[in-house]
Amino acid sequence: MYKIAAENLQALFQKIAADQDLYLPVKVSDQVNFKAWSEDAEVCLDTLKTVKSPKDAFFPQSENLYTCKKEEKNISIEPQALQEKNFVVFGMKACDIQGVKVLDNVFLSDPIDTFYAARRDHGTIVALACHEPEESCFCKVFGIDCADPVADVATWMIEGELYWKPLTEKGEALTKAVAELLNDADEAKVEEEKAAIRAIVEKLPYSNLSLEGWGQEDYMDRFNSPVWEELYKPCLACGTCTFVCPTCQCYDIKDYDTGHGVQRYRCWDSCMYSDFTMMAHGNNRNSQMQRFRQRFMHKLVYYPVNLSLIHISEPTRLLSIS
């Protein structure tokens, strides 16, 4: 276990960014999101949650896959280069890290998504425990411990000092790279901090919500429940919930005519859109109620049954936009 004074964090960021890209919570125009670090960036590690999740670091909102070029009768295809430079995502919360685990199940299963895999291979995650969870938090319901995040490095901000604990080979490598800035620390304060955070979580109003009834048994009763006809009505079909969600991974693949060829690119899509996965045989979900129901059934029933992992990890962010 190590620690570093808060006033020395700028030096820590400089040290990390000297060798690799560094992304962390940065405030821009009154909004905090994960962005590339710079000397004049307003870093906000005390922000409980960013507007968007940091999943962009591993699954970008838009990315080129390959480019087709035509010169007279000759056609060439240039694949997009995979991620080669190492990078660090600093300050991720336990719920967002759980979101990455969900993405891993999707993109690292056969057939492996090489673009995603390259970013995971080159990315190091530094987690930051939630010092004071909000009233709307209920990560405990999904088995997430916000007091003890599991990543390459786990950190806790306690009384003006950042406590630092490497947990993986990547974490050990990063720790070695910044060792001159770290001091040895006793784990006692961290254990006290964990206990204090968990005590807060236990008192939160939604911490004891139950997922009973959302399993495989009787799922058709849930599917056919008349309650969906009421629940979907406030939905604007804007898709914002899917874009800020750390676990949503739906995407579309499109072609863009550059004038000199065609770029094929991948971009996020949303199951809440009326034209989502428009198929030739016409088997689309025609109503917003059906799309709304599919989103929740996918996260709470279909995905857990198939992959033994709940497809929700950060409900508080979704509540803040509703």
For the regions a protein language model found, what residue spans apply to each?
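Secreted/processed peptides and extracellular or luminal domains of membrane proteins
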Residues: 101, 145, 241-247, 251, ...
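Iron-sulfur-associated redox domains of electron-transfer enzymes in respiratory
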Residues: 1-218, 248, 310-311
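Non-heme iron-sulfur electron-transfer modules
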Residues: 207-212, 251-298
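Single conserved hydrophobic/aromatic residue that forms the stacking wall/gate
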Residues: 310-322
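Flexible loop/turn segments at secondary-structure boundaries
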Residues: 30-33, 133, 244, 252-255, ...
